[in-house]
Amino acid sequence: MKTKILIILLLCSSTSLFACDICGCFMGITPYDNQSSFGVLYRYRSYHGYNGQSQQIFPPYSSFSPVKGKNNFPPSSHNGLYSDYEVYRTTELRGRYFLQKRLELNLIVPYLNNSENYNLQNTTIGGLGDINIFAGYHLLRKLDKKIINQRLIGGLGLKLPTGNNQAKSKQGLTYVNPFQAGTGSTDGFVYLNYIIGFKNFGASLNSSYKFNGNNKRQESIANSSTQFLNVFYKIDINEKLKVIPSIQTSYEFTKGEKYKGLETGVHETNNVLTGFGLDIFVKNIGISSSIQTNTWSVKTDHPRSSGRVTLGLTYNLNQLYYAIN
């Protein structure tokens, strides 16, 4: 019974998150067992420090929280200054509805606030991002076993070009595609989420692959993949309060920007992040948090991935009926 409860709790935690912030693919919060849910997730991602330089997850003079838009400066080149950074902040409204016990529909509406600082020139743009719609099917659902419980979810979805992709500097120059609130392209993605629990211990493995289209300027981002591994332990404070600490690691890969189908090498992402997570459950409410820092990244001429922070709040409904039996 404890193992079953552990799997159910994990399904509503942010510990099943997997992400690629540059390419716009970010999955989870996964829901309470067959219960519809809604919530808000704030995620912060930073890139700081060229090859050979130290890194900070919160670069000097940057902000963890959203800041006022400022587009006084045109896109700038990279000259290796330690003060250079890119910061991506996203606030997401998330909803999930179970049509049937094994079939779920998901909606993510993001609002972006992106900042970059190059050559001592700081720019921030923001706005509604690209909306994600996706469906997941619970291929394996064994939650009533005495020793080991498992769940496997497979899904697919679309990222719609709802975000502005035309932001320009005061000089009339268009900012690069990944820095925009939207990519201007319709993209598709597939994912798998496997969770296993043994008594109070458990692990979650997530994998996603994203097929990126072109926008009107024939810009795109190369197809991307993300893998996320999370090992966790459930602590029962009392009947109403559960706490799940976790150790997390993720691997992200994309060859970066493309123009007219050709790879430019700009914003190439090939890195490993590791860190910790903490999820707290009080009745139907889930509070999630995580922090990851750079463990390894490929050599590029851009600031390297330095870290990620997420904060989430989810309410899980007491769903008794389904549209499809």
Show where each model-derived region lies:
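Residue-level signature of outer-membrane beta-barrel architecture
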Residues: 42-44, 97, 109, 137-139, ...
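Outer membrane beta-barrel transmembrane domains
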Residues: 51, 59-78, 218-325
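Detector for outer-membrane/organellar transmembrane beta-barrel domains
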Residues: 34-49, 177-259
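Transmembrane beta-barrel strands of outer-membrane/channel proteins
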Residues: 38-44, 107-111, 154-160, 205-209, ...
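Outer-membrane pore/translocation modules
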Residues: 113-220
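Short loop/turn motifs that connect adjacent beta-strands in outer-membrane beta-barrel proteins
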Residues: 26-35, 51, 102, 141-151, ...
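A subset of solvent-exposed loop/turn segments in beta-rich extracellular surface proteins, enriched
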Residues: 23-133, 141, 145, 259-260
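Residues that define the transmembrane beta-barrel architecture of outer-membrane proteins
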Residues: 34, 87-91, 125-131, 150, ...
